[in-house]
Swiss-Prot record:
Pathway: Purine metabolism; XMP biosynthesis via de novo pathway; XMP from IMP: step 1/1. It comes from Korarchaeum cryptofilum (strain OPF8). Keywords: CBS domain, GMP biosynthesis, Metal-binding, NAD, Oxidoreductase, Potassium, Purine biosynthesis, Repeat. It holds the Pfam family CBS. The lineage of its organism: Archaea, Thermoproteota, Candidatus Korarchaeia, Candidatus Korarchaeales, Candidatus Korarchaeaceae. It catalyses: IMP + NAD(+) + H2O = XMP + NADH + H(+). One of its GO terms (biological process) is GTP biosynthetic process. The active site is at 299 (thioimidate intermediate), 398 (proton acceptor). Its EC number is 1.1.1.205. NAD(+) binds at residues 242, 292-294. Mycophenolic acid (MPA) is a non-competitive inhibitor that prevents formation of the closed enzyme conformation by binding to the same site as the amobile flap. In contrast, mizoribine monophosphate (MZP) is a competitive inhibitor that induces the closed conformation. MPA is a potent inhibitor of mammalian IMPDHs but a poor inhibitor of the bacterial enzymes. MZP is a more potent inhibitor of bacterial IMPDH. Residues 93-151, 152-211 form the CBS domain. This is Inosine-5'-monophosphate dehydrogenase. GO terms for molecular function: IMP dehydrogenase activity; metal ion binding. Catalyzes the conversion of inosine 5'-phosphate (IMP) to xanthosine 5'-phosphate (XMP), the first committed and rate-limiting step in the de novo synthesis of guanine nucleotides, and therefore plays an important role in the regulation of cell growth.
Length: 476
C-alpha cells in the first residue's frame, strides 16, 4: 500500500452544508421518497435492533409515513407474530376474518372475542354470510348455552369489495353501525370493514400502506437463513439482509438464492465502498442498499478490528455506483445519524433514506422497560454485536458465518424520550429546515443543489453552542 493512494474516509463532522439562495420555506419541503415499490412520506426507516424495532415501533413508523424493520434476534415464530401484528393494526378491508357459525354457542363467540380482542363476528354457513354478532349481543345474553343464531343480527348491512373509505364512513354513520361485512355478488364473505380502521385511515393519511390498506413492514434476515425468509414472506413487504459486511462472496451468493426463491423485495447491506455497491447492484435484483459500516453509536467494529466505512463516505461511494449504472436502487444511510443535521448531509451526498437506531432508542415504542436512575428515566440500548445481544444467539451470524468469538458492540442507557411521534416530528422539522437553508425543495434537489465544504475542528467547535453553560447542565 502506497501512502499516496490513501483515501479520505470523511464523516459527518468533517463536512458542513453551505447555505444557498432560496425561495423554499421549510413547510413546503417535500421529503417523500421511494424504495422499490414502497412509497414513503418521510425518508426514515427504524433499525432492526432488538432495543429499537418490534411491532409497536413498526406500527408507529408506518403510520407516520416511514417504515419499521423488525429485528431478527428472536425465533422466526416471534418475528412472524410481530409482522402479523403490524398487518392487523390497520386494514381497510380485513381479509382474514374470524367467524362463527349459527350453531356455535354464545359462550364460544364470547371466547373468540376475548381471545382475539375483537368486538364482532360475522356469522357464516359455508362461506355465505347469514348474520353478525357483536360484543353487545353476547353481553346481554345471560344464558351462555344460547346459540349464535338466537342473538345474531340477521341480514346485516353489507358492501361490495369496491367500497371506499369515504363511502364506508357514510354508511356507518347513516345506520349507526361499526362493522360492515364485505361480500361478493353471490353473498360470500370476502372481508370486514370496521369503524376503527376507517378512523385510523383518516387519522393517518400519509401512512405507509400496501395495496390492501394495511401498514407496511420489513424484517431483517440472515442471508444464510432461507427458511426464515420463506416463512416471513407472506407477512412482510421487504426483507433486509442483516450482516455487518455484505461484500462477501458467500453472503452475495446466499442473498441471490433468497431473491430467486422467496419473491419478496430485498434491501442488501451493510456495505461501505463503491466496489461493494457496484457488485451488489450489478449481480443482484435488489431495491435498496443499507450503507455504512462501524458508525453506529453502539458499534465497536472499527475500534475492535480497525476496519470501518464511515456512513457519509459510504453513502457518497454507493450513490456514485448507483448513478453510474442508472439503477433504481435506494441508498439508505445507516449509522451515526444522531439528528437531522447528519441526515441532511447524507441526503446531500446521495442518500434516498436514512435508517435510525440511536435517534429512536429510548422512546415509548422501543422495546424494553424503563428504569429510574438518579431521578431520571432511561431505557437500554445495545448493539447487535454486544455480548448481551449475542447471548440470544439468533443474530450471532450478523458479524460472520460461523460467528466470531468477539463482541463488536456495546450496551448502554439512553434517556427516556417519550412518544416516538414527537421525536420523529422534531427530526423531520429539523430536516426540512436544512433543506430550506440549502434551497432544496425535495431530496432530488438536495442531491444536486447542496454545496458541501470541509470544516476544521475549530470550525465545528464554533458552530456548536459555546462559551455558556446550558441550563439543563446547571440543573443536573
Amino acid at each position: 500500500m502506497r501512502i499516496d493512494r490513501f483515501e479520505f474516509a470523511f464523516t459527518f463532522n468533517d463536512v458542513i452544508l453551505l447555505p444557498g439562495k432560496t425561495e423554499i420555506e421549510p413547510s413546503n419541503v417535500d421529503l417523500t421518497t421511494r424504495i422499490g415499490n414502497i412509497a414513503l412520506s418521510i425518508p426514515i426507516l427504524s433499525s432492526p435492533m432488538d432495543t429499537v424495532t418490534e411491532e409497536e415501533m413498526s406500527i408507529a413508523m408506518a403510520r407516520m409515513g416511514g417504515l419499521g424493520i423488525l429485528h431478527r434476534n428472536c425465533s422466526v415464530e416471534e418475528q412472524v407474530n410481530m409482522a402479523k401484528a403490524v398487518k392487523r393494526a390497520e386494514s381497510f378491508i380485513i381479509r382474514d376474518v374470524i367467524t362463527v357459525s349459527p350453531e356455535d354457542s354464545v359462550e364460544e363467540a364470547r371466547r373468540l372475542m376475548r381471545e382475539h380482542g375483537i368486538s364482532g363476528l360475522p356469522v357464516i354457513v359455508g362461506r355465505k354470510l347469514v348474520g353478525i354478532v357483536t360484543r353487545r349481543d353476547v353481553y346481554f345474553a345471560e344464558n351462555g348455552s344460547l346459540l349464535v343464531k338466537d342473538i345474531m343480527t340477521k341480514d346485516p348491512i353489507t358492501v361490495g369489495p369496491e367500497i371506499t373509505p369515504q363511502e364506508a364512513r357514510k354508511i356507518m354513520a347513516r345506520y349507526k353501525i361499526e362493522k360492515l361485512p364485505v361480500v361478493s355478488e353471490s353473498g360470500e364473505l370476502i372481508g370486514l370493514v370496521t369503524a376503527k380502521d376507517v378512523f385510523y385511515r383518516e387519522s393517518h393519511p400519509f401512512a405507509t400502506r400496501d395495496e390492501e390498506g394495511r401498514l407496511r413492514v420489513g424484517a431483517a434476515i440472515s442471508p444464510f437463513d432461507i427458511d426464515r425468509a420463506k416463512t416471513l414472506a407472506p407477512y412482510v413487504d421487504v426483507l433486509v439482509t442483516d450482516v455487518a459486511h455484505f461484500h462477501n462472496e458467500n453472503v452475495i451468493s446466499a442473498t441471490k438464492r433468497i431473491i430467486d426463491e422467496v419473491g419478496v423485495p430485498v434491501i442488501a447491506g451493510n456495505i461501505g465502498t463503491y466496489e461493494a455497491a457496484e457488485e451488489a447492484i450489478t449481480r443482484l435484483d435488489i431495491i435498496g442498499l443499507r450503507v455504512g459500516i462501524g458508525s453506529g453509536s453502539i458499534c465497536t467494529t472499527g475500534e475492535v478490528t480497525g476496519v470501518a466505512a464511515p456512513t457519509l463516505y459510504a453513502v457518497a461511494s454507493a450513490s456514485e455506483a448507483v448513478r453510474k449504472y442508472s439503477k433504481d436502487v435506494a441508498v439508505i444511510a445507516d449509522g451515526g445519524i444522531r439528528g437531522p443535521g447528519e441526515a441532511a448531509k447524507a441526503f446531500a451526498m446521495g442518500a434516498d433514506a436514512v435508517m435510525l437506531g440511536y435517534a429512536l432508542a429510548g422512546t415509548k415504542e422501543a422495546p424494553g422497560s424503563t428504569m429510574m436512575i438518579g431521578g431520571k428515566m432511561y431505557k437500554i440500548y445495545r448493539g447487535m454485536g454486544s455480548p448481551s445481544a449475542r447471548s440470544k444467539r439468533f443474530a450471532m451470524d450478523r458479524y460472520s458465518k460461523p460467528s466470531k468469538d468477539i463482541a463488536e458492540g456495546i450496551e448502554g442507557l439512553v434517556p427516556y424520550r417519550g412518544d416516538v411521534t414527537t421525536v420523529v416530528d422534531r427530526f423531520v422539522a429539523g430536516l426540512k429546515a436544512a433543506f430550506g437553508y440549502v434551497g432544496a425543495a425535495n431530496i432530488s434537489e438536495m442531491k444536486s443543489k447542496a454545496r458541501v465544504a470541509l470544516i476544521s475542528h475549530s470550525g465545528m467547535s464554533e458552530i456548536a453552542p459555546h462559551d455558556v453553560k446550558p441550563l439543563e447542565k446547571i440543573s443536573d
